[in-house]
Regions:
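Conserved catalytic core of nucleotide polymerization and phosphodiester-bond processing enzymes
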Residues: 1-150
Length: 152
């Protein structure tokens, strides 16, 4: 979903890496941390973690002040490493002022805090796609077949 929303700002770069490379390794190389660390940081960042939580996602043992500083440093490096992300975040901040996000299907998702906007947008849109996929597959299946959506 992030690739979809970044595309207008990065000319499809993120999507190309997702489909032809390893986005986590690419980001790790650009930020200067391990692939495992960047995966943890990515999800903390996308789910709206504050600087302390972001810093502790990198190193669980950091005291609060050090975690806040590390989180701020990681946030800055992460945004700088992904072309178009700063612009997407600014658009999210601007749109969050209306109190809702438009999911991929145009449906309104209520957003109570600006830092949650991107997370709500990504997860709401992903849920819409998953639900449509299940309906489509269900229509193609034999009547006695069963279907279950499992998030991995």
């Amino acid at each position: 979903m992030l690739a979809h929303y970044l595309a207008r700002y990065d000319e499809g770069r993120y999507a190309r890496i997702l489909t032809t490379g390893d986005i986590h390794q690419t980001n790790a190389d650009r930020i200067g941390i391990t692939r495992r660390q960047v995966k943890t940081v990515t999800y903390a960042f996308l789910y709206g973690a504050g600087n302390i939580k972001l810093g502790r996602s990198f190193d669980k043992l950091l005291p609060e002040e050090a975690a806040a500083q590390k989180g701020a440093d990681i946030r800055k490096a992460y945004v700088a490493a992904i072309p178009g992300l700063a612009e997407l975040l600014q658009a999210c901040k601007t749109r969050s002022e209306r109190g809702y996000a438009n999911a991929i299907d145009g449906r309104r998702i209520s957003v109570d805090k600006g830092h949650k906007f991107l997370n709500y947008l990504l997860q709401g849109s992903a849920a819409t796609i998953a639900k449509r996929w299940m309906v489509t597959i269900n229509q193609c299946m034999p009547a006695d077949a069963h279907l279950s959506l499992i998030h991995i």
